[in-house]
Regions:
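Structural signal for interior beta-strand "rungs" in well-ordered beta-sheet cores
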Residues: 40, 101-310, 315
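Terminal amphipathic alpha-helical/low-complexity segments used for targeting or macromolecular assembly
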Residues: 1-105, 117, 166, 171, ...
Length: 356
């Protein structure tokens, strides 16, 4: 695709500095851009523009006034990120589905209910009493087990499994190989054998939730495991049975949440956070990468480390730990001085006794 810079200025309502007939063929980040690219910089004042990029054109904040080398055409906008996303969308139009409607190579149970404009790809399997909302898209290899429901305009990518009686809301995205509603990891070991405990609950995923590839969300024992509206879940996240995840949480890659954890709204868990069972995480809390959370977390708290503690406390511990070798040397030196002083004192006391 080839687009004139003047057309991009019109698209973004930006101010153009430079050649309006400049031809742009692609969008690129600063470090990989070439003479066919348009790129962007949200903080251009931090860059040396003689070396920052080989792009032909740059999207910059409207407030930025420093002149760039003449080789750059410039597009000045109010919101750099939003403008560049609009330009990128122009160069990367969505591909049309390779299938439309219900493939005759998909299995759809006679008792299933399909909304208008549903797309079901070959080799998908739709079980008894399943309900699929209007405009939903199910790719190849998807399995929706009996009694489950998929909301309107939800996209389910290949090889996703939604177990029986689970509910997926509208406008959700389920990426490849995620599993919704597997049995929770609960066992009765009183007999000496590990006997699977009751797993009669379900999973309820509210609207506008995104679930990453290979993520797993277990069904509740008697009630539903709940994922709140607008929550975004990264790849390889594991959420155990009976959890209640609030609205608009961000759960980054490889987070593991044990059973019956409750989170408030707008909680952020960075990569590889681990949360023990039956804890409460308050709204707006941030759990730093690889935090091992062993106690309840208040709303708005920022915690890090293993075991996780408030960020400032953990930083003090890390500073002290970094100084530990030096501190050990000082302690050894002080101990040696003390021993020498005590020896001298003993010698003086012995001499004084002899004189008496």
């Amino acid at each position: 695709m080839k687009v004139l810079l003047s057309q991009l200025a019109e698209l973004t309502q930006g101010d153009l500095v430079g050649d309006p007939n400049c031809v742009i063929e692609k969008t690129s980040p600063l470090h990989t851009a070439d003479s066919r690219s348009i790129t962007f910089a949200e903080k251009p004042e931090k860059l040396d523009w003689n070396f920052a990029t080989n792009a032909r054109a740059v999207v910059l904040p409207r407030s930025y006034e420093i002149r760039l080398p003449e080789r750059f055409a410039i597009l000045k906008v109010d919101d750099v990120k939003t403008a560049f996303e609009a330009i990128a969308a122009l160069f990367h139009p969505k591909r049309a589905l390779s299938h439309s409607g219900v493939s005759d190579r998909a299995y759809v149970a006679a008792s299933a209910t399909l909304g208008a404009n549903v797309s079901i790809a070959p080799f998908a399997s739709i079980g008894d009493d399943v309900v699929i909302g209007d405009g939903a898209v199910l790719h190849s290899g998807v399995t929706i087990m009996p009694g489950a429901s998929i909301g309107a305009n939800t996209v389910v990518f290949p090889n996703v499994v939604v177990y029986e009686n689970c509910s997926i809301g509208a406008n959700c995205i389920l990426h490849a190989n995620c599993v919704i509603g597997a049995y929770g990891f609960g066992y009765d070991s009183s007999s000496g054998e590990h006997i699977l405990a009751a797993q009669y609950g379900s999973v309820v995923i509210e609207d506008n939730v995104e679930i990453g590839a290979c993520a797993t969300i277990d069904r509740g024992a008697y009630d539903a495991t709940l994922i709140g509206e607008g929550t975004k879940i990264d790849n390889h996240v594991m959420i155990a049975h009976n959890c209640k995840i609030g609205k608009r949480n961000l759960l980054c890659a490889s987070v593991g949440i044990a059973g019956s954890v409750t989170t408030g709204d707008y909680v952020v868990m960075a990569g590889r956070v681990g949360v023990r069972d039956h804890l409460q995480i308050g709204s707006g809390a941030t759990l730093g990468a690889m935090a091992g959370v062993m106690t309840n977390v208040p709303s708005g708290a920022r915690i890090v480390g293993i075991p996780a503690t408030p960020e400032k406390e953990q930083m003090r511990k890390q500073v002290a730990l970094a100084k530990l070798p030096e501190t050990q040397k000082e302690v050894r030196a002080l101990k040696k001085e003390l021993e020498q002083a005590l020896a001298r004192l003993d010698a003086l006391e012995g001499k004084s006794g002899d004189e008496r």
